[in-house]
Amino acid sequence: MSGKKGSRRGFLGAAVAAPALGAMALADPGRAAAQAAGVKRGDLPDLTIKQVKVLVLKPEERRAPAGAPGVPSGPGGRGGGGGFAGPPGARTGEKLASIVTNSGIEGNYTLDDRYFHPNWSNLGWLDYAKNAWVGKSVLDLPALTSQWRPSLRRYGQLSYAAAVDNCCWDILGKAAGLPVYRILGAYRDRVRAYASSQHLRTVEEFVADVKHAMSDGFTAYKIHPPSGVAGGHDYKLDMEVIKAVRKTGGDNMPLLYDPVGALTREEAMKVGRLLDELHYVSFEDALPTKDIDGLVELAAALDVPIVMGEFMPSLYDYVPYILRGATDEVRFIVDNIGGITGGMKVARMAECFNMMCQPHNWGTLLDHVVHFHCELAMPNNIWFEVTQPLGTADRPYFKDKITLDKEGYVPAPVKPGLGYELDRGVLDNMMLRVES
């Protein structure tokens, strides 16, 4: 263990850290940030929630963007609505949450991505949202999403709240005429993107994929190796991929690696030493999330940052990982942690400990976008994960797409709300039914 790393971990004493954790992590970001952006309650229309709906779209044939090497492995793809939503040609019917206020402002979010609720369904979410939110003001968002509420402390309940929370932030931005990140408190106006690979099968596919990403303008790349959720656990193949991607990307390209918790402790140590040797910048989900002792050992032995948090279902789950030094950086999925509101709490909690925070981005356009707004408002993040190949997350019922500038950054949206506008004509043509 290096002296630098050991001294830093020793500094994380629970007696010193716990007061800061409670003070900052449980703070509600919305109201104070809105005031800082110059938005006052009296300036806004009636934001009482009037109606909650689910827009169910017709199945569509999904295809990989032109020139993309390889296909995602396994039926259904990653994360339900993520990636190609299964191999090219698979048919999926996507679902959008719709929340409408008395003043007619609508907020939307996807219901197709990762949710931890044990009995997730459209009708279950509708029942929750109608009973808990109709008649309430969007301005009272913290009172409805805080984990101090006993009902939201139960496993998975934050998933139900997350979809509503994201819709409400969309509404707030539209009402104020500002992109959401401006209300949260803008820290930057663009974020550097890295191409986040599919679970490809061979070294050759990864080499082709890195070249494709570089030709699209990406300056960084993350490996989702064959030993991930696609099956075919073979850490030795992972190591060959890791070496080939470094050789292809060159010495200066930031590279990240995410086996999605598929490795054993022994395998993770061997892979981690190779990541150190080749100067990778992130080792995400090196072990299953619950193996906190193994993560402590791994983090102490390696220089590559260990990144955990994607599969944590509440704010409280992060605490032992931070205090015990089981992770160098934290990560979140807003769908699991209470929406944008919960994600910003995780980011602030990490900031208390001088830690970086990497939000997850994978899935549909809106899944990318809600995390993007958090990233634009966070001082302790430098990355925007973009599903590879570029264009995979695009949907025909949106007028806007994720684009890279000439330096490989994604510029902030300028439109109000989530900032990526629905094409109502296309959406209406794709509508299968409305559940309410």
List each language-model region with its residue ranges:
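N-terminal secretory signal peptides and thylakoid transit peptides that target proteins
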Residues: 1-19
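C-terminal segment of N-terminal export signals and the immediately downstream linker at the start
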Residues: 25-84
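Flexible C-terminal active-site loop/helix
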Residues: 42, 47-50, 54-57, 61, ...
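Metal- or metallocofactor-binding catalytic centers and their adjacent structured scaffolds
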Residues: 46, 100-175
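Conserved, mostly hydrophobic/aromatic
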Residues: 104, 177, 283, 321, ...
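Shared catalytic-loop signature of beta/alpha-barrel
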Residues: 129-131, 273, 279, 290-409
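Glycine-rich, aromatic-flanked loop segments that form ligand/cofactor-binding clefts
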Residues: 156, 165-198
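Metal-dependent enolase-superfamily TIM-barrel catalytic cores that perform enediolate-based chemistry
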Residues: 190-302
